[in-house]
């Protein structure tokens, strides 16, 4: 194999909706799926708890999360990078 090994870990992009916990953020990931019968695109969403070691991400930030080993009962994702900072109005 001369090619570089690809990462088998899943990555998702979502929006931080809560950063109140210590070293943890709640990330809302939205997916558009086509309804099997009617053909309309519907938004499906799910929340993930992700590890934020430095407490540097705040509500409204778009972040990329990567699947990891279980860190706690509900946390098995780690924030890998900031995609877009929250807009200040």
UniProtKB/Swiss-Prot annotation:
The keyword rRNA-binding applies. It comes from the Bacteria. GO terms for molecular function: rRNA binding; structural constituent of ribosome. InterPro entries: NA-bd_OB-fold (IPR012340), Ribosomal_uS17 (IPR000266), Ribosomal_uS17_bact/chlr (IPR019984), Ribosomal_uS17_CS (IPR019979). Keywords: Ribonucleoprotein, Ribosomal protein, RNA-binding, rRNA-binding. The keyword Kinase does not apply. One of its GO terms (biological process) is translation. GO terms for cellular component: cytosolic small ribosomal subunit. Part of the 30S ribosomal subunit. One of the primary rRNA binding proteins, it binds specifically to the 5'-end of 16S ribosomal RNA. Belongs to the universal ribosomal protein uS17 family. This is Small ribosomal subunit protein uS17. It comes from Ralstonia nicotianae (strain ATCC BAA-1114 / GMI1000). The lineage of its organism: Bacteria, Pseudomonadati, Pseudomonadota, Betaproteobacteria, Burkholderiales.
């Amino acid at each position: 194999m001369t090619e570089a090994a690809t990462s088998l870990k899943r990555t998702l992009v979502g929006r931080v909706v809560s950063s109140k916990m210590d070293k943890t953020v709640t990330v809302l990931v939205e997916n558009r799926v086509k309804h099997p019968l009617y053909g309309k695109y519907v938004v499906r969403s799910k929340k993930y708890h992700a590890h934020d070691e430095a407490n540097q991400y705040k509500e409204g930030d778009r972040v990329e999360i990567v699947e990891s080993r279980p860190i706690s009962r509900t946390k098995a994702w780690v924030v890998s990078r900031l995609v877009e900072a929250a807009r200040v109005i």
